[in-house]
Amino acid sequence: MSTLFRVAWYRFRATFSHRWSGYLTIVLLVGLVGGVAMGAIAGARRTQSSFPIYAASTNPSQVDAFIAFVDPAIHDYAGYYPAKARAMAHLPHVKEAETAIGFDANLVLLSHLHTHAEPGQKPPVFEGSTNDDFTKEDRVTLVQGRLANPARRDEVVMNAQAAHQLGLHIGSRVRLGFNSDAQLLSPDCCSAKATPPKVVVDLRLVGIIVVASTVVQDDVDHLGSQVALFTPALTRELAQCCATYSSSALQVDGGAGEIPHVQSEIDAVIGKALATAGNGSGATAGQVQVAVATAERAIRPEAIALAVFGGIAALAAILIAAQVIGRQLRLGADDASVLRALGAGPAVTAADGLLGILGAVVLGSLVAFAVAVALSPLAPIGPVRPVYPYPGVAFDWTVLGFGVLALVAILGALSVGLAYRAAPHREAGRRRGAAARASAVVRAMATAGLPVSAVAGVRLALEPGSGRSAVPVRSAILGAVLALTVVTGTFTFGSSLDTLVSHPSLYGWNWNSMLLSGFSGDEDLPQHEATTLLEHDPYVSGISGIYFGSLKIDGQRVPVLGGSPGAPVQPPLLSGHGFDAANQVVLGATTLADLHAHVGDTVTVSNGATKPTRLTVAGTATMPAIGTQGPHLEMGSGALLDYDLIPATARNLQESTVPGPNAFLIRLRPGANPTSARRSLSRIESRLNASSDGAGGVVGVLRPAEIANYRSIGTLPGLLGGALAVGAVIALGLTLVASVRRRRRDLALLKTLGFTQRQLAATVAWQSTVAVAVGIVVGVPLGIVVGRTLWNLFARDIHAVPLPSVPILSIVLIAVAALVLANVVAAIPGRIAARTPTALILRAE
């Protein structure tokens, strides 16, 4: 073994001067494409974990207790009870407590502002705490300006949504009035006869903040995500006179196992207080805790897409590197034959040049490590990126360590295998058993009378030849196929992703518009009047009235969409059939899995008011993001069933005298002008919601979080795709150059037979073009199949309608660009071959 190494080391030093360029090529290709692969996979992991890491940095609470609300119907006449807040803060296992006090119903906007409310969007929530400025527990994140001074009553911070809705910016001033609780409960409240507000405050917006629970959300939650925070100084002044509601956020000591005990203790405290202090709605999981699960699910598609891209890049790195390594070994075949003639054994001839290649693989893997680290500041992608607490360079040692080891091990093994296969004793055996085979394509072209340069070029591209002049033409063609497969597959997957984002029907919004009642659909639309107006609208082809609610299905609480059996407008199906009868239910795919049920099974639905009902699972559908604030339908979760299963009181929470659906799903006639239709529907909405004080509206689309967040992923996918394309182009170019150089002897013979310089250049161009053409014929369809297959797997994973998109124009441009590249690459070696004296090439023969 020591002798073998000494010989290999000697040969490495002796041949390095004319083999270094090949080694450098291996280093650069492995480093670039392998680094992109590791960077993408590490970025996917960093993206998927980004929100839990951010949430942990805000010091989140685990339990929320909504303890007071001004409402005579529940005998609650004040929005804040300090005694209840103190009692919960001193419960066993509670280590920290923060009480947020809201002033929404008591608040009067006295400034004349240019507001920008979207249809169905709620006004901003105005809250404050008496003992915290939201910098300790459930910390807010400052993104612009500064935090308010806790000791000043005239400063306020808002999130960007609230500032945009109110038309404010840093430095803007707004005047607010606050009615006392007694004024709020007065019959004359908020009318022209009402007394002036008890407290008037001029506030200046000093900062834009982000609240953790609103970082990742769908468009339904976005309708109610506007938040403004008062200082403790102002909150203490308003708490005793003008509070609408209050809730306590609690941190639990002792781990997650103590949370249920604390929740039961909170319910007991609230129950004891009923006789003297009002009513409470119990304890729930903290907002940030709930948001973590939602955010991880919403971010997952971007992380999966990034990981899929990384997997494609990793495969490309291995295959491209294998091609380059094989060519490098073949370049030393003549030297290996000389060594064999001098008495070297199979081990020595196989090891010739292998030491340099293995060194290049190791060095390239280290370069890939550096490239992946250099790409790390581009992650995480998505909505968490602006508030991620630990941006910049990151070392994901799991990906980096395993990635480097995998590259070294896989490429090292391939190098040894290729070196053994290319050893002279094996090569000689193959030559003895191989016979020169003529290509049918070449014969056909010759028979057709095509120019001799064309026939010669096609022969050089397709026929390997025999004996010492044999050339591995399959490697050149395989390199072209590989490059075009990778690029086409990447473009197909990316096009399908763009199609999903731009086609709402693929993510559940299987209609054109929704007529919404109240804020986020929390009121009713008069059934008869709304149906009559919509059915007589010239632009409308179909409508379905729907109700929002939640029911227990097989004991699990599930958000539901109540409709009528056989309604013309329903979410798009994934399996089975639609909701056609009152004894049927259509479920989201995630909900179906959570219930451990299948299409055709029977489930039990209960509402707590009537006898449980057994329903047959008719099918699964891509559920839209739809409903009111809180738990609502999402892409994979929810149920569509008969609206009569939702209790009548739950369908009419505002106790409307003319009850009806919370919303209407509207499908327009084919060819209807969208602008004219929107104006017509807006007139209907104004008539139906005339008394809603601006609430409700016509909504074009509500996107799920998975889709809404896609637009915030930044430039990383484009950069990675560009790097992969560059790697594929470089590999293709090197393949073509090496293929032409291997044919120098054949070109010299053609020149001896009378070929002119122009004919030689044409021959080389034909050789290169044919190799790429075969790559196009095989690689493009294969890339489309790979891209479509990956997309179908991805779409089913996120429960979207699996409809892959093939970018025909882009693929045509890829094919044209590949042909242009083939001729550009062939021009230089073709010109060199034409000008090289024949004697220099044939002298070795």
Show where each model-derived region lies.
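Juxtamembrane segments of multi-pass membrane proteins
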Residues: 59-77, 444-447, 451-581, 586-590, ...
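Hydrophobic positions within alpha-helical transmembrane segments of bacterial inner-membrane proteins
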Residues: 34, 311-314, 318, 323, ...
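Interfacial "coupling" helices/loops that link adjacent transmembrane helices in transporter permeases
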Residues: 15, 19, 319-358, 396, ...
